[in-house]
Amino acid sequence: MNRQEKAQIIEQLKEKAERASIAIVTDFKGLGVEEFTQLRANLRNVGVDCQVVKNTLARLAFTGTDHEVLADKFKENCAIVIGYDDPVAAAKAVADFAKESKTFDMRFASLEGKYLDEDGVKALSKLPSKEELLGKALGTMNAVPTNFVSLLANVPRGFLNVLTALKDQKEAA
């Protein structure tokens, strides 16, 4: 690989790191080609990139980005998983694959510039997704006016029931 190719890889990875909300560093030693292809497909389905890069190139690419906390931690063979929109979806996809595979491990991550160890990534993977949280918030916000309108409707309804009962009572008499 010549200097120009290395510079291009660094530039591409730096651009991805600048857009990323999460970067997870994984150990893929012992992972077969089929398994790694399956991992990439799983990650692609949730809008996440996975890239294997030399440690020195990764160090240079992550320096000067929000995920700079990872720059000095690249050692041994590693694959970098980069998530853009939903960090929980990226963490879930990686954690699920790590459960299935005996040779694939999460090492550490950077979530919007904050360092997370392996336990932190696992904890993040157990949180509800962005869509689920938005749905719960919307449901909660919608419940307040609905309950208020129902409460307001009960007053005239109760009054109408009393009038109907009085009418029935007078008709019976």
Swiss-Prot record:
Keywords, comma-separated and alphabetical: Ribonucleoprotein, Ribosomal protein, RNA-binding, rRNA-binding
Gene Ontology BP annotations: translation
Coiled-coil residues: none
One MF annotation (Gene Ontology) recorded for this entry: large ribosomal subunit rRNA binding
Domain of life: Bacteria
InterPro entries: Ribosomal_uL10, Ribosomal_uL10-like_sf, Ribosomal_uL10_bac, Ribosomal_uL10_bac_type
Record carries keyword RNA-binding: yes
Recorded GO CC terms: ribonucleoprotein complex; ribosome
HAMAP family named among the record's database cross-references: Ribosomal_uL10
Subunit details: Part of the ribosomal stalk of the 50S ribosomal subunit. The N-terminus interacts with L11 and the large rRNA to form the base of the stalk. The C-terminus forms an elongated spine to which L12 dimers bind in a sequential fashion forming a multimeric L10(L12)X complex.
The family this protein is said to belong to: Belongs to the universal ribosomal protein uL10 family.
Function: Forms part of the ribosomal stalk, playing a central role in the interaction of the ribosome with GTP-bound translation factors.
Name the record gives this protein: Large ribosomal subunit protein uL10
Species annotation: Maridesulfovibrio salexigens (strain ATCC 14822 / DSM 2638 / NCIMB 8403 / VKM B-1763) (Desulfovibrio salexigens)
Gene symbol of the encoding locus: rplJ
